[in-house]
């Protein structure tokens, strides 16, 4: 009953468009940047030149999502720093 009262002024097409925007925004800002971080962390020292070029292109493309996670991720190499 409550859901019908809230969604009755909004058409089903508008809700589908809103859901598509939320899905694409979540992919662009959360899912792909996290996958890109993990892929670059594993492959950084063994990338070829074309793979590195594509990684730089993807960093440029997904920069807003990467900058959201930058304060929380530590990708330093093991063995760096004071003991």
Swiss-Prot record:
GO MF, any single term: quinone binding
Subcellular location: Cellular thylakoid membrane
Membrane topology according to the record: Multi-pass membrane protein
Catalytic reaction(s) noted: a plastoquinone + NADH + (n+1) H(+)(in) = a plastoquinol + NAD(+) + n H(+)(out); a plastoquinone + NADPH + (n+1) H(+)(in) = a plastoquinol + NADP(+) + n H(+)(out)
Entries under PANTHER family matching the protein: NAD(P)H-QUINONE OXIDOREDUCTASE SUBUNIT L, CHLOROPLASTIC
Function as written in the Swiss-Prot or TrEMBL entry: NDH-1 shuttles electrons from an unknown electron donor, via FMN and iron-sulfur (Fe-S) centers, to quinones in the respiratory and/or the photosynthetic chain. The immediate electron acceptor for the enzyme in this species is believed to be plastoquinone. Couples the redox reaction to proton translocation, and thus conserves the redox energy in a proton gradient. Cyanobacterial NDH-1 also plays a role in inorganic carbon-concentration.
Protein name: NAD(P)H-quinone oxidoreductase subunit L
Source organism of the structure: Prochlorococcus marinus (strain MIT 9303)
Gene responsible for this protein: ndhL
